[in-house]
From Swiss-Prot:
Pathway: Secondary metabolite biosynthesis; Alkaloid biosynthesis; Mycotoxin biosynthesis. GO terms for cellular component: membrane. InterPro entries: FAD-bd, FAD/NAD-bd_sf, FAD_mOase_fung. It is found in: Membrane. The gene is asqG. It is an enzyme of class 1 (oxidoreductase). PANTHER family: FAD-BINDING DOMAIN-CONTAINING PROTEIN-RELATED (PTHR47356:SF2), FAD-DEPENDENT MONOOXYGENASE ASQG-RELATED (PTHR47356). FAD-dependent monooxygenase; part of the gene cluster that mediates the biosynthesis of the aspoquinolone mycotoxins. Within the pathway, the FAD-dependent monooxygenase asqG catalyzes the epoxidation of the terminal C7'-C8' olefin to produce the intermediate [(1'E)-5'-(3',3'-dimethyloxiran-2'-yl)-3'-hydroxy-3'-methylpent-1'-en-1'-yl]-quinolinone B. The first step of the pathway is catalyzed by the nonribosomal peptide synthetase asqK that condenses anthranilic acid and O-methyl-L-tyrosine to produce 4'-methoxycyclopeptin. Its EC number is 1.-.-.-. This is FAD-dependent monooxygenase asqG. FAD binds at E33, V47, R113, D313, A326. It catalyses: [(1'E)-3'-hydroxy-3',7'-dimethylocta-1',6'-dien-1'-yl]-quinolinone B + NADPH + O2 + H(+) = [(1'E)-5'-(3',3'-dimethyloxiran-2'-yl)-3'-hydroxy-3'-methylpent-1'-en-1'-yl]-quinolinone B + NADP(+) + H2O. The chain crosses the membrane at residues 448-468, 482-502.
Amino acid sequence: MAAFTVIIIGGSISGLTLANVLEKYGIKYILLEKRPSIGPQLGATVVVHPSGLHLLSQLGLRERVEELATPVELQKAIGPDGTFVLNIAATNQCDRTIADALSTGYMPMFIARQDLIKVLYDNLQDKFRVHASLGLRELEWAGDKVKVTTTDGTSVVGDIVVGADGANSRTRAEIWKIADVEDPSYGSQQLAKSIACTYRCVFGMVDDGDSSLARTAYLAFQYNRAYTYLPTDSGRAYFLAFFKNPAKTVNDAIPRYSDQDEDADVAAHANDIIVPGLTFGDLYKRRTRCTLVPLQEYLLDKCFYKRVVLIGDAVHKLNPITGRGANLAIEGAALLGDLIKHALEKSLQPTDEMLQTAFFTYQQCTKSRAPSQIDDAHRVQSLAALENPLLKFMSLKLLKRATADKLALGVAVDFSTGHSMRYLPQLPQRGMVPLNKDVVANPEHRPASSTVLWIILMLGMASLGAVWQKHQRAEEDQPIHGYTLLTLSTFYNLMILFASAVHGSLGRRAVNLSFSDDSGMVPFYAVGHAPDKYRPTTPSRRVGLLVPGPSYLGSGGHFNGLLEVA
């Protein structure tokens, strides 16, 4: 019996991550890359966040990535006039305490896209399975197999095909073409309409940046445009210039840009301040690499057809201003690798039904995780580009209130809900925040009807407490009565429920935590697990969802709260 074979189209971050996972799992694969070499000088830099670093650690790659990457220790934002409007750092004991309590143990870092691809490629033991200069020309079914015809006429047959060939995926185009003929209800034309573009971006690099600015991510705000500047310890620096398009375009109408378009954007905005003392024009003159591309944004509602599945930018694409794209690609590849391994544990030759189940699970997980990241990136872009007076006010006046503890909370939520590969050795917890898989009281989905029922119940309990108090005579020095405490507790719960409704979170996932700390400082910790220095009470299910900040409740304080994890 021939070994189950996975054909990977594209030597991208997602494609090479999947190749590494499959190799670790002993699953045969063939990777086809259309370009003459693996890891060409395309793109500028990518940011690897804690959830991605955890997966790279499982593959044994964290140390090598850290050698080549620059950690992000500070985040600063600059207004149109060149003054700082945001400086996120742990600048006081309060911020440091909360940031430490929410630590994941992994520092976000940026690395050249080419370097990350090289790390992934170099880690492969069986490099003979990777073939350059072989792009996809056509897909067709061959019984219970898939036949791939490459651009040079070579035919390769496998059990499944994984399209990891980017935003302009040839694999995606092929399955849409096939589905249009075989199953018009698949809706490929509707899927294509979800691919939209509202911004374009100049990706660039200089080799003579100021290394004294390293380890800081700079974001420059301008009207209908924005800039990201990432200097490294070596003096190399990466920059991204985002420009809002005149109108939103969809799929085939999304423009392609020429060198003349790039020159025009630079000429129009050369005086924009990137950091104090450095303009966009100055930076562009010193560029060693640069390109102007459209920024597609989308999440496909369907990411597979029969025995072909899409990963990475082929299925979801977000604005790079938050640096989350590579992380999603790594996570998706790791998840799909786990699902393929799981199917093969049931049968060495999984049936169509078994593979469809695996792909559907991957699709649903992607649709659960990716939307918030795509929406966050879109919102950050709108804020940075000062798109309207309200966003201008928020960016230039309110953003300066952001602190390290608030940033740490967002990182903790993202990390805790990330994926961990099931069939590789599980790593010890590095920071204070665990993954959901390590939490006993995991969050659950809850229907809105249950939330409404709890609201009614809590209102009833609050009313009982209030009625009882009307019949009690309390002296000035009398301690608070138990029913008053009941009323206050109920009011607290109602406020959580109200916050949940306001944030549109009814029916989403939440977990209740309750911590005591003799120090009197009780930072709100993440997702159902307390470090040793805290004494957790029994976690209980509650309805609603809220993300509170730190609470200082006095010596021996006690804190209950709910943390968003979906």
